[in-house]
């Protein structure tokens, strides 16, 4: 499960820097249910 800082770090790792868009719904989903790298890469 990715919440808070862990979620942001996973996005930065997957997207490579600041090229990502925030998605509150995805953040909540990842925190509650967990996310795969594919789920996170959608935000890039």
UniProtKB/Swiss-Prot annotation:
<dbReference type="Pfam" id="PF03488">
    <property type="entry name" value="Ins_beta"/>
</dbReference>
<feature type="modified residue" description="Pyrrolidone carboxylic acid">
    <location>
        <position position="1"/>
    </location>
</feature>
<feature type="disulfide bond" description="Interchain (between B and A chains)">
    <location>
        <begin position="15"/>
        <end position="44"/>
    </location>
</feature>
<comment type="subunit">
    <text>Heterodimer of a B chain and an A chain linked by two disulfide bonds.</text>
</comment>
<feature type="disulfide bond" description="Interchain (between B and A chains)">
    <location>
        <begin position="3"/>
        <end position="31"/>
    </location>
</feature>
<protein>
    <recommendedName>
        <fullName>Relaxin</fullName>
    </recommendedName>
</protein>
<keyword id="KW-0873">Pyrrolidone carboxylic acid</keyword>
<dbReference type="InterPro" id="IPR003235">
    <property type="entry name" value="Nem_insulin-like_b-type"/>
</dbReference>
<keyword id="KW-1015">Disulfide bond</keyword>
<dbReference type="GO" id="GO:0005179">
    <property type="term" value="F:hormone activity"/>
</dbReference>
<keyword id="KW-0372">Hormone</keyword>
<comment type="similarity">
    <text>Belongs to the insulin family.</text>
</comment>
<keyword id="KW-0964">Secreted</keyword>
<dbReference type="InterPro" id="IPR022353">
    <property type="entry name" value="Insulin_CS"/>
</dbReference>
<dbReference type="GO" id="GO:0005576">
    <property type="term" value="C:extracellular region"/>
</dbReference>
<dbReference type="InterPro" id="IPR051777">
    <property type="entry name" value="Insulin-like_neuro_ligands"/>
</dbReference>
<dbReference type="InterPro" id="IPR036438">
    <property type="entry name" value="Insulin-like_sf"/>
</dbReference>
<dbReference type="InterPro" id="IPR016179">
    <property type="entry name" value="Insulin-like"/>
</dbReference>
<feature type="disulfide bond">
    <location>
        <begin position="30"/>
        <end position="35"/>
    </location>
</feature>
<dbReference type="GO" id="GO:0001664">
    <property type="term" value="F:G protein-coupled receptor binding"/>
</dbReference>
